[in-house]
Amino acid sequence: MKRMLAFLCAAALLLMLAACGTNQAAETTQAPTTEATQVETTAAPTEAAEITVTDMIGREVTVTPGSYKSVVCIGAGALRMYSYIGDVSLLGGVEDIDNTTLEDRPKMFDAVARPYVLAFGDVFHTLPSCGVGGPQAQTAEAEKILSCAPDIVISEYEDVEKEDALQEQLGVPVITLKAGPKGVFDDAFSGSMALLGQIFDREQKAQTLVDFVKSEAAEISSRTAKIADGDKPSVYVCGLGNWGTTNHLMTAENYVSFQVANVKNVLSGTGIQGIGPIEAEKFVEIGDSTDIMIMDAAAVKNIKPLYQEDPTMFDTCKAWKNGEVYLEMAYNAYYTNFEIALINTWFIAKTVYPEQFQDVDLTAKTNEVTKAFLGQELAEKIFACPSSFGGYQKIDTATFFH
């Protein structure tokens, strides 16, 4: 009997130990499951917070930074500026003027270099239309924009009432950009870049680009700052685009590239505001004082037939007679080519003050600048455009226009 009792006690003890072991094993295998769930919870993204931003024409707009999945850009320059900062894969539509595969669209800039189109045209070609676009398009096409289903619109229509009305009609934020009279060197351009960076959660990219432009401008200015006025040649810039039209009389007294590079403008003191035409008589009047002529590439197609018809006006210009005519790349092509405006400034500085810029190679500089703006080296593509005529160069006036 005692032996039987001892056996039963031992068996009971073994069963208790086995049960404890089973519970411990269960606890051990369950623990990793709990930890894995916690990791998934902490890894889940937090919801972005709404903020109110002030756009470049003073409108307060509520946005949710970093949340946007479908972007539409409308108006001259909007898609270009977005391309500098934003993710083009988020675009939900483009204006017809920027989709070069369409037959029925504005084509006045097809031969002219537009670096953002050269960089991302293959993306633009796949997108639906958000409107016609082009210099003559002065009103946003709300129905076409809605058909692209954007959750935000980037605009360059600088009219507060129209932008407010469009935002109300679309039901999504409409953010207005602008560049300002000094173009790429203007605080408004920097502000537009910063605004895009804030909205699309790319603030570092925007700041890097703004810092790059400021550094480039400072470098150009520092190299030319100590040149005496008496040693500066008088320079005339012509062919600047304005609403898609231009010729040898279209110029600017306050051409910002001249200001940055400390270049003497032959029209200084005439009171011309912005880009605009001078009279033919004024062109003849300044002819003897013009040491160097800078011609914008976009104007050649218009200047060539004028010269062939009557070369006498051109021949009154000293720079023309002496072969001191130089070709810059297109400053404007559906608004300002901001990266080209910066490269043009290097070209002008090197042309007018060659000793100070002997180390600057324009092809390398073009690639450096387009890489900073668009992430791609585009010199070859820019210079290959029909209206670029092979790139920056000195023009042989005896043969170039014949």
Give residue spans per PLM region.
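Structured C-terminal subdomain patch of bacterial secreted/periplasmic proteins
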Residues: 133, 184-200, 207, 211, ...
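Positively charged n-region of N-terminal signal peptides that target proteins for export
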Residues: 1-9
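Bacterial Sec-exported substrate-binding components of ABC uptake systems
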Residues: 20-81, 204-237, 356-402
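A short, structured surface patch at a secondary-structure boundary
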Residues: 79-144, 152, 157, 266
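C-terminal motif of bacterial Sec signal peptides marking the signal peptidase cleavage site
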Residues: 15-19
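Proline-aspartate-enriched helix->loop->beta-strand connector
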Residues: 68, 129-137, 141-158, 279-298
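Alpha-helical, coiled-coil/dimerization segments enriched in small aliphatic residues
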Residues: 247-274
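Extracytoplasmic ligand-binding site segments that recognize negatively charged/polar headgroups
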Residues: 99-107, 136, 159-165, 177-195, ...
